[in-house]
A protein has these predicted regions:
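Substrate-binding pocket helix/loop in short-chain dehydrogenase/reductase
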Residues: 102-103, 107-115, 206, 210
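Active-site helix of classical SDR
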Residues: 126, 163, 171
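Short C-terminal tail/terminal secondary-structure segment
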Residues: 1-4, 152, 241-267
């Protein structure tokens, strides 16, 4: 049955940034598809809630408090999956971020942090996960959560967009190096109804602008992204690697314009 190709029974998945929003949705979705899920994030109470939700649905999960910018935490997250459950099949690099900031007031420190959070940490997580996937499960799948900010002209997102664009290219390059045993793909996420979009969704004027600029007429949901992540994590995508899957409501231009001061001659 073709639906069986989307099942993850007997597999073990690690999801970073799993305490809230998209990461939480992905963790729950993978568990519903049969995976044992190891969830990592910085806030223990958030992780406990995710684990409780998974267990209430009949799934199995383990919480590991993790800051993906800390080497010891990254290693503990991967090691916990292998030590507790004997294998590793899936890694979802969801942790990432940094807010909007106009280019002319973006500091070197801010830019460096955007790169570390959005591409360096996912690279190091992937590096740690690949060999255990091969050794314990014969291979696996890495799913990187990227953003449409990576391939659109979007004011105030120079640091974040650069980090996600680098993540996209890293995905392609790792896919070539890790094939055929470990697949590596990414999801280019549009505007999703999470805490980060709350300022837009709670303002009638901004929400109307967002929906008018989105062909599907609504923001995404964490479940929308979880469905895509399940496809890329599961045997259903066994002939797919090195690809960026856009899940964005059909947007080909920014759903929101962030006003920034234009450059002027110095007086």
């Amino acid at each position: 049955m073709i639906l069986d190709e989307f099942r993850l029974d007997g597999r073990v998945a690690v999801v970073t940034g799993a305490g809230q929003g998209i990461g939480r949705g992905i963790a729950i979705g993978l568990a519903e598809a049969g995976a044992t899920v190891v969830v990592g994030a910085r806030t223990a109470s958030d992780l406990d809630e995710v684990v409780a939700t998974i267990e209430q649905g009949g799934g199995r999960a383990l919480a590991v408090v993790t800051d993906v910018l800390v080497d010891e935490d990254r290693r503990r997250l991967i090691d916990s999956a292998v030590e507790q459950f004997g294998r590793l099949d899936v890694l979802v690099n969801n942790a990432g971020g940094t807010g909007p900031r106009p280019a002319m007031v973006t500091s070197e420190r801010f830019f460096d942090m955007a790169m570390k959070f959005n591409v360096t940490a996912p690279f190091l997580m992937s590096q740690l996960a690949a060999q255990p996937m091969v050794d314990t499960a014969g291979g696996g799948s890495i799913v990187n959560i990227s953003s449409r900010s990576s391939d659109m002209q979007l004011s105030s997102f120079v640091a974040y967009g650069a980090g996600k664009a680098a993540l996209n290219q890293m995905t392609r390059n790792l896919a070539g190096e890790f094939a055929p045993l470990v697949r590596v793909n990414a999801i280019g996420v549009g505007g999703v109804a999470t805490q980060g979009l709350e300022v837009v969704l709670t303002n009638d004027e901004l929400r109307a602008q967002f929906e008018a600029n989105t062909p599907m007429g609504r923001p995404g949901t964490p479940k929308d992204i979880a469905c895509a992540a399940l496809y890329l994590a599961s045997p259903a995508s066994s002939w797919v690697t090195g690809k960026l899957l856009h899940v964005d409501g059909g947007c080909e231009r920014p759903a929101m314009e962030v006003p920034v001061p234009r450059l002027r001659p110095s007086t």
